[in-house]
A protein has these predicted regions:
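ATP-dependent NMP and nucleoside kinases share a basic, alpha-helical "lid"
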Residues: 88-165
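Small-molecule kinase domains that catalyze NTP-dependent phosphoryl transfer to phosphate-bearing small molecules
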Residues: 71-72, 117-124, 131, 135-136, ...
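P-loop (Walker A) phosphate-binding loop of NTP-binding proteins
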Residues: 12
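Walker A/P-loop
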Residues: 18
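Hydrophobic anchor at the beta1->P-loop junction of P-loop NTPases
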Residues: 9
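ATP-binding Walker
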Residues: 15
């Protein structure tokens, strides 16, 4: 039996991390975990509960009532759950997107989510994407990929995604939201997004999904051969 590895995919929002992670997991027969969805689920709970996400004490207090997990839908696709209920659709709206970085930077929130993420990946065979997967969650991951793309490309991708779902947003709103999230993700005190020397960098501004997948699979095969 081929040995399994953990694959960490980090990068800014709307860089295609989830798309690549899902494709790799499906091809390898690994478990895909969208760590960002976990923080979005926590954020959704705060919004539903009328908790001020800028009030750290209030968020920490409400965190005791949050249980985040995953379940497979009818298509055997992993969906994030909030207190036992799938919220895969609800967590993708612009309101959650505009607040998630504020919630995710809180130490108690990250501690709770990281512990869950590490438990999921303890037996290897996991592809997880996020901001701190290779630096904090799986610092010993056999393969770490850092994904990036130009701000213009990222904004266009996000605009297309939200428009397809019927959300009424402007490209300018999305660009500002991405810029705001980038600043918080890179500058927060707890687990900031960071490119370290052990990452493979994948700039997909001008790459097709097929080209990205082929490049990443090459790195996967190299990593497996090294264990």
């Amino acid at each position: 039996m081929q040995k399994k590895i953990n694959i960490a995919i980090d990068g800014y929002s709307s860089c295609g991390k989830g798309t690549l992670a899902k494709a790799l997991a499906k091809s390898l027969g690994y478990v895909f975990i969208d760590s960002g969805a976990m923080y979005r689920a926590v954020t959704l709970h705060m919004l539903q509960s009328k908790v001020d996400v800028n009030d750290e004490a209030a968020v920490v207090s409400a965190l005791a009532n949050v249980q985040v997990g995953f379940e497979n839908n009818a298509k055997q696709q992993s969906e994030v759950t909030l207190n036992g209920v799938s919220v895969e659709s609800e967590i993708r709206n612009i309101e959650v997107a505009s607040k998630v970085s504020e919630v995710a930077k809180i130490a108690a929130v990250r501690t709770k989510m990281v512990a869950l993420q590490q438990a999921i990946g303890s037996n290897r065979g996991v592809v997880m994407d996020g901001r701190d997967i290779g630096t904090v969650v799986f610092p010993d991951a056999e393969l770490k990929i850092f994904m990036t793309a130009s701000p213009e490309v990222r904004a266009q991708r996000r605009f297309a995604e939200l428009s397809a779902k019927g959300d009424v947003v402007t490209l300018e709103e999305i660009a500002k939201n991405l810029e705001h999230r980038d600043t918080i993700d890179a500058s927060r005190e707890n687990s900031p997004l960071m490119l370290t020397g052990d990452y493979r960098v994948l700039d997909n501004s001008d790459l097709s999904k097929e080209a990205q997948f082929a490049m990443a699979m090459g790195w996967v095969n190299e990593a497996i051969q090294c264990i």
